[in-house]
Structures are given as structure tokens and as C-alpha cells.
Amino acid sequence: MERWQNIHKVVVVGLGITGLSVVKHLTKTQPQLTVKVIDTRATPPGTERLPEQVELHSGGWNTEWLAEADLVVTNPGIALATPEIQEVLAKGAPVVGDIELFAWAVDKPVIAITGSNGKSTVTDLTGVMAKAAGLTVGVGGNIGVPALDLLEQDADLYVLELSSFQLESTLSLKLKAAAFLNLSEDHMDRYEGMSDYRQAKLRIFDNAELAVVNRDDQETFPDTETPLVTFGSDEQAYGLEADGNRTWLLDHGQRVIASDELKLVGKHNLANALVVLALLKAADVDYHKSLNALKTYTGLTHRCQVVADNRGVKWVNDSKATNIASTIAALSGLESTGKLYLLVGGVGKGADFTPLKPIFATLNLQLCCFGADGDEFMPLHESATRFDTMEDVIQQISSQLKTGDMVMLSPACASFDQFDNFMARGDAFAALAEKYA
């Protein structure tokens, strides 16, 4: 392949899951190359899985290797502004990420998703619905399987979640369609400001045939002329139509499905579903064949996931909400006919929780505060009650639950006061739901 004509020595920076996938891809598809790995950690994960012929320099940089390299493949966690990477760029050698290598090798349609919130759900649901329509689909990138490992599946369609970090080192990824869901403050330790962060995200549109953007968030629109389609909360294009007490998902005026037919919870998830419809249509997938898959989709584990629905009471696990923005997103447009029993608390990481107060005021709410920083939530609603643990909360409220009520864990805090991680916290909630539902 022409791209590889003048490339003989490749240095992979950063091991771990992504680095290993790069090494495996290079040694398999370009066996003529000399591949070396640099990792600044003393004992990087995955060392024992490196092929014998691949040298590893760990515990610091190896500037000699970098100076000799014809190509450097860097890990998304390493900023391009890192001095050692800047030196490589200054001497004119290309620096790319694993997604760029994927772009060089892929020969089937690709769709990709970025955004500050919701991208994992959109990526996963797009894959689920495309599979239900009869396609072989490779789903991965920033979620689950590294992009290069997906190439082994020989899929009809690839669906990638891409972070801003991955997009920084991607130059030529051709996409059937690309979605930019929303933009909110994140990774400000890596970027100079919101504008810098947004520019990294916008790179997803550089070689896209169609941009799918959020009408309710103008920051998602490309700065250059790109064919685009929009989604949003009004009735245009991909949108929502309120009819009495039902809400319909629309595709350019045509009703597709009503929100009460879906297992997904929250208005933000209706927006996510609209994006999926737009992406599938752009990739020539007939989404009408897979509406059943949309109806039964419960969401990613620990993200607004319905874990029990018994006697008219929904139990929703949103343990992934480890900050205020995630909890606000989960509560916005929540459809519940009865009382919402909301479990909040854990390790607050010094956050100011007062932005939750106005949204709490709009809800028929029983606020259940637990964990190390549970006290921080007590002034935010008159119903606030203090508990030690999540189990204490469920034991106390289980006898009060009525048809139409919802019990939701969306803690706005980290979990490590009482759990190993947010997954363990979510699993504990799901087990309690099963016991008491």
C-alpha cells in the first residue's frame, strides 16, 4: 500500500488495550516494519502480551527511538502538546492515533459519534439496531473494543464512538455520517478552553459525507460547509411531536414511534434515539426493520438503565452519573406519573450541588441522601432525608411505593466511599431492586 512505502520504523507510544491493538495490527498487516513501544510507566499493562520481536522501553521516554521513527502512533491519553511529541512533529514525521490507522485499513462504511454526553448510548444503540436490520456490525472505538480489533470481524458497517482526544490525532477518516451530540465543559485540564475543546470535536466532520447536529446546541454545527441534518426537541427534521399526553419521534414530519413504547428513560434518551435514526438512514440501513430493537433497548448498564419494572414501579440505575451535569441530564424531561424517589450522595469531589435545586423544585420528589457527602444535598429540597447507605434507603422506602412511582439512583457523586467503583454501586442497586421490587 502506498501509505507504507516510506515507512520502515514505527514507534507506538503508550501500551494498554489501545497500544496492544496497534502493535497486533501492525505486526499482522505490515510484517516488514520494525515496531517499538515506549511507555513512561515503569510496568505498563499488557507487557506480557507483546510479541517477542517488539522492543519495549518503559519508565520514561526514548528520544533516540522517536528521532529515528518514520511514524509515531500515539495513545489518545497523551496530548499532542507533550514536548517529546512536538519534537517528532517538528522534524516532519507523522504522528497519528489508532483511529487514523483504522482509517487507512478500513474498506467498509463507517459512522462515528462524538459529544460530551450520551455518545456511548448512541453508539451502542446504533449498533444494536443495525444488527437487528440484518447487518454484521463492528462497534467500538472509545467504547468497548479498540477500533483496529474490529477490523478482524469483517463487518458490513462500523460504528465508532470517538473522543476529542482520539480526534486530535485522526486526519483522514472517511465517514458515511458523523454525529456531534452536544458540548459541555469537560477535560479543561487538557484544553486551553471551550473553543479549543470544540475544535477537537469538530474534526469528526473533516471527511464526513453528512453531519448530524443538535438544533438545541449551536456549538455542534460545523464551521465549514458540510451537508447536514439536525435533531432536536421541536418538530423539524428529526424531532419530537407532543400530541395530548404522548410524544412521538419524527423523521421529517413522519411519526416513527411513540416515547411510551420505549423502555429508555428521559428526554435526553429520546434525543439519542433520534440521532440513531438519522445515522442509520444515512448509512442506508432501513431502521423500520429494527424498531422492535429500539422498543426493547434498556440502555447501557449504569446509564439511566431500567433494572426492574414491577407493579407499575420503575427502578432506574444511573450510577454512571458521577457529576452534577449527568444527574441534570437524567432528570431533564423525566416522564413519571407518580413520585420520584431519587438517591443521591457518595463522594462529592468538592462540587457545588446548588444547580440541582431548581430542577428538584419541578419534580414530585422524595430526595434520599446517603454516603459520605449526603449532607451536601439536604438543603436542596424540603423532602430530603438522610440515610447512611443505599440499602438503608431502599429498606425504608420500599413499603411506600405505589403504581406510577420511580426509584432512581443518579447520585451526582463518585462511589468510592462505599463501593469500588460506579459499576459496583449500580450492581448493588440492581440487586436491591430485584429484592424489593
UniProtKB/Swiss-Prot annotation:
InterPro entries tied to this protein: Mur-like_cat_sf, Mur_ligase_C, Mur_ligase_C_dom_sf, Mur_ligase_cen, MurD
The primary location reported for this protein is: cytoplasm
Q: Which GO terms describe its cellular component?
A: cytoplasm
Q: In which pathway does it act?
A: Cell wall biogenesis; peptidoglycan biosynthesis
Q: Which residues bind ATP?
A: 115-121
Q: Which GO terms describe its molecular function?
A: ATP binding; UDP-N-acetylmuramoylalanine-D-glutamate ligase activity
Subcellular localization, as worded in the UniProt entry:
Cytoplasm
Keywords for the protein's UniProt record, in alphabetical order: ATP-binding, Cell cycle, Cell division, Cell shape, Cell wall biogenesis/degradation, Cytoplasm, Ligase, Nucleotide-binding, Peptidoglycan synthesis
EC code: 6.3.2.9
Give me the reactions it catalyses. UDP-N-acetyl-alpha-D-muramoyl-L-alanine + D-glutamate + ATP = UDP-N-acetyl-alpha-D-muramoyl-L-alanyl-D-glutamate + ADP + phosphate + H(+)
Q: What processes does the entry annotate via GO biological process terms?
A: cell division; cell wall organization; peptidoglycan biosynthetic process; regulation of cell shape
Pfam (any one): Mur_ligase_C
Record family assignment: Belongs to the MurCDEF family.
Functional summary from the UniProt entry: Cell wall formation. Catalyzes the addition of glutamate to the nucleotide precursor UDP-N-acetylmuramoyl-L-alanine (UMA).
> What name does the UniProt record give this protein?
UDP-N-acetylmuramoylalanine--D-glutamate ligase
Q: Which organism is it from?
A: Vibrio campbellii (strain ATCC BAA-1116)
* Lineage, opening ranks: Bacteria, Pseudomonadati, Pseudomonadota, Gammaproteobacteria, Vibrionales
The gene from which this protein is expressed is murD
